Amino acid sequence: MEVAILFILVIAMLMIGVPIAISLGLSSIFFLLTLSDTSLASIAQSFFQAMAGHYTLLAIPFFILASSFMSTGGVAKRIIRFSIAVVGHFPGGLAIAGVFACMLFAALSGSSPATVVAIGTIVIAGMRQVGYSKEFAAGVIANAGTLGILIPPSIVMVVYASATDVSVGRMFLAGVIPGLLAGIMLMVTIYIIAKMRNLPKGDWLGWNEIFASAREAVWGLFLIAVSYTHLTLPTNTVV
């Protein structure tokens, strides 16, 4: 009976438009306060005891928060501008730049959905404007977004390392080469398809634009350098 009431509360909140996270949280709190003998204090204590020895998992919510800040704070736009300046002049340049931007953002966010949302919302619209098909643009970003869990730092790697008691740093190092190879192979494939289909390419913007866009994206690129040189622990890095 209690379980049925809990499900009814969640579904009712979802039907009136309450966000999923808030629906789950409020229904659980209401259930604990009214229908359960367990106190909220004991739940907090149990959670703390479960986290003991697995402090690396604290990096996960910080990665999610950091990716949200970078998506809304303009870091994604600066990375896209830098990517277009570097590779946008090749055949299929905007698509290749989208993959390159996904690789850079993946090295910051550690999440595939965050990478797709941050880069895809900008790049797909740009690709459609210059003549790419909707299917091709969506396919490129969908494939490039998967690099978010392969190129370190990765949330999946943090969870696996914590569950198996292996080094997070070693997990990150193990994902560098496969992630780079996957990204490069995807860019080469786009280049070949662009040559065969005569897809649009951008103009060479010059070294001044590369340096100018790099200066704007410097803090995002600096965070990548910090993560890959292991100057801090994973949790400290994302903070």
Predicted regions located by residue number:
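Alpha-helical transmembrane segments of multi-pass membrane transport proteins
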Residues: 1-234
